[in-house]
Structures are given as structure tokens and as C-alpha cells.
Regions:
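Proline/Glycine/Serine-rich low-complexity intrinsically disordered segments
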Residues: 1-175
Length: 175
């Protein structure tokens, strides 16, 4: 597929059988089964470098926050932080650009993808400014009308050792 939302549409429409690196959400449970998490990562807010580190997300009352359209965190934010104004974006780079330009206060995603992208492309302008208590539990999602498929992937995930997980992280993390 060309982007995350197209991937979600394909799995919903049963044009594909699995989707990797997906977090469970109430909505997604209506059409997917999930393995246990492969990776568990903190959810963070990226801000401009000159913004203060936040101790409490309520300090952003009525601020615009960008979130990737279709990201599980959007449901969570709408439920638990309704005072934040969500701006859905088509890509992470679009969200980070809006932060850089001052059109939104921050962009929310998991720490792994954000820290890597900030270091590569936005190191002079953006930083991690807040960490939520919620975690992004990246799992494999399978069509819920194919329970045997979920059993197979669940066994594969159960067999992953910590060395393999660390190799994956090392591949995608810049130090």
C-alpha cells in the first residue's frame, strides 16, 4: 500500500490478511485479532526546541496537536484529553512540518519513530517535549474471520527472543 490509512482500508476490506506494527484499539478489535506486542514503546509529543518540557499535558489546553490519521492514539486522546484540538495529518513528516512552522503545538507518535526522524531531518528545530503514560504496543493484526492465522502469528511472536527484538531496534534506531 502507499500509506498507513490505505493499509487500514485494505485490512478492513479483507484485501489483505495481516498488518504488522499495529496497536490494538477498540475500533480495530471489531475487524482484527492481535498477537501479543512485539515492541512496547512510549508515546511522546514532539515540540519546537524552544518550547518548555511539559510536566502535565493539561498545560496544552486548547492547543492544536497533530496526529497521524488512523493512529490508535487519536481515540485515546479524544477520550481522555478532550480539551486538546486534534489535527489529523496524512503523514508523520506533514505533522512534524506543522510543528516546525508553528501551525500546531506538537505532534504525537511513538518515541522510536519520532526520535529517529527528528535526528535525521529536524535536529535543529524539534525535540521530544512530553511523554504520555500510555504505551504503543506494536503487534501483528490478523483478519478476525481467520482465527487460525492469528494462532500461527501468535506462536511466531511467542518464539521471538530478545536478541531478535534488539536487532530490530538497532536497525531502526539512531544513536
Amino acid at each position: 500500500t502507499n500509506n498507513w490509512n490505505e493499509s487500514l482500508d485494505f485490512i478492513k476490506d479483507k484485501k489483505c490478511d495481516i498488518i504488522s506494527s499495529i496497536s490494538p484499539s477498540y475500533d480495530r478489535m471489531s475487524y482484527l485479532n492481535f498477537t501479543k506486542p512485539i515492541l512496547t514503546l512510549p508515546i511522546v509529543v514532539t515540540t519546537q526546541k524552544d518550547k518548555p518540557f511539559l510536566r502535565d499535558i493539561s498545560l496544552l489546553k486548547n492547543e492544536k496537536i497533530a496526529i497521524l490519521k488512523g493512529h490508535f492514539i487519536a481515540e485515546y486522546i479524544k477520550d481522555y484529553f478532550p480539551y486538546l484540538k486534534i489535527v489529523e495529518v496524512a503523514s508523520m513528516n506533514e505533522g512534524l512540518y506543522l510543528v516546525e512552522q508553528g501551525e500546531v503545538y506538537g505532534y504525537i507518535d511513538n518515541a522510536l519513530v519520532l526520535s529517529s526522524t527528528i535526528q535525521k531531518e529536524f535536529s535543529n528545530s524539534l525535540k521530544i517535549g512530553f511523554r504520555f503514560d500510555i504505551l504503543d504496543e506494536l503487534s501483528i493484526g490478523t483478519r478476525n474471520d481467520e482465527p487460525i492465522l492469528n494462532d500461527i502469528f501468535s506462536r511466531l511472536v511467542d518464539d521471538l527472543d530478545e536478541t531478535k527484538k534488539q536487532e530490530f531496534l538497532n536497525t531502526w534506531t539512531i544513536i
